[in-house]
Amino acid sequence: VEFVLETIEELLGSNENRMLFIWDSLALTPAVSDIEGDFNPLSSMAVKARILAKGMSKLTVPIANSQSTFLVLNQLKTNITRSPSETLTTPYMTPGGKAMIYAYSLRIWLTGRKAKASFVTDDKGFRIGSEVKVKLEKSRFGTQGRQCNFKILWGEEVGVQDEESWLDAIKSSHHLSNSGAWFTLDYGDGTSDKFQSSGW
């Protein structure tokens, strides 16, 4: 963790160009004390969170001033807590402490579905992708809390199929009306299109 933060600081100080930093992944990056210490988890408890808190307080302004982007990938972990109410309301958490959450300008929560109905398969029945649910947990650019679903593909057709999520995004628009299985999209100039969600 220390090496990642130090490298970003060094690159920001030696380069005047805008940069994109991608950290994959925060959860699997150990601190120095994790590597040099023993197997007792209590010996390095909250060390990574404290390092990240210090690191983000140092890097947030330089990243913003250079108009760079810092993209952090993380994993969901089961929230082990003694509070039954918190277990029900927040079953998952992300490693790294709250400093990262406060520093994020945009926080996107992706969860995959385990049901076979969410699998994307090819003509031979092999799985080539999966449908994920996406929620905008935090945003300094727009309305947070919005949700959509889209499909992530891997292999030769790697990428995101997000056409269906466009329909979810415009369902609340006054230009789109719904009657049964049919949607009508009004362009505002007297013309419109009628379609079903399967033909979107």
Language-model features, listed with the residues they occupy:
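PDZ/PDZ-like groove recognition
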Residues: 169-179, 183
